[in-house]
Regions:
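Membrane-helix interface and helix-disruption motif detector
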Residues: 50-57, 108-116, 158-165
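C-terminal ends of transmembrane helices
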Residues: 18, 69-84, 126-133, 178-185
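Hydrophobic core segments of alpha-helical transmembrane domains in multi-pass membrane proteins
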Residues: 56-63, 118-125, 165-173
Length: 189
């Protein structure tokens, strides 16, 4: 028996809603990485202004801590795992590709030099735009647009200014949407 066009549309809408509800569970990741990158950027900015030779210490402490916390979150989610919709599977693959791409860019930062953070901002923009579009969450789309604007500016900015642009980018692309998702998750519960 074949579904009517309306039944097919209803099924797609239901899949999107299911993916949205599960996406709310990912709010800790956005809050974690948004706050981690924002704080590390601002710490490095302040230390650079004070001519501190250990200006990257925030990254050295915060990134490994965030990775450890993310692994704990993932393990907790895997214990509660259910089957994933097609949209969720595609988004998982997209985030995996984002992580690999980010890693490649960051390990080549010495070669990229002042182009590193503008490229990172573009990667943030692409990933949050795709997520926001797929799940119809406007906060991510707005955040991605802000990241793209910050990336364009960053290509012409000093390293210190790039740190501020990076902090602003993750504030709008990760932290604020993550907090909004958390709020929606609590309202849905």
């Amino acid at each position: 028996m074949e579904n009517t066009p309306q039944q097919q549309l209803d099924l797609i809408a239901q899949m999107i809603k299911t993916a949205q509800r599960r996406f709310y569970d990912d709010s800790p990741f956005y809050i974690l990485w948004g706050s981690t990158v924002m704080i590390a950027s601002l710490v490095q900015y302040v230390l650079l202004l004070n001519h501190n030779e250990y200006n990257a210490i925030g990254w050295a402490i915060l990134i490994p801590t965030a990775i450890l916390l993310q692994l704990i979150f993932i393990r907790k989610q895997q214990k509660q795992a259910t089957s994933k919709t097609h949209i969720e599977q595609v988004l998982n693959h997209m985030w995996f590709a984002f992580g690999i791409s980010l890693f490649i860019v960051l390990i080549n930062a010495n070669k990229l030099q002042l182009n590193t953070y503008p490229i990172v901002l573009c990667l943030y923009a692409i990933s949050t735009y795709i997520s926001g579009s797929a799940l119809k969450i406007n906060a991510f789309i707005v955040g991605s647009i802000i990241c793209w604007i910050a990336a364009v500016i960053a290509f012409f900015a000093s390293f210190e200014t790039q740190l501020l642009l990076l902090a602003a980018g993750v504030l709008f692309a990760y932290l604020i949407p993550g907090i909004l998702l958390r709020k929606l998750e609590k309202e849905a519960a």
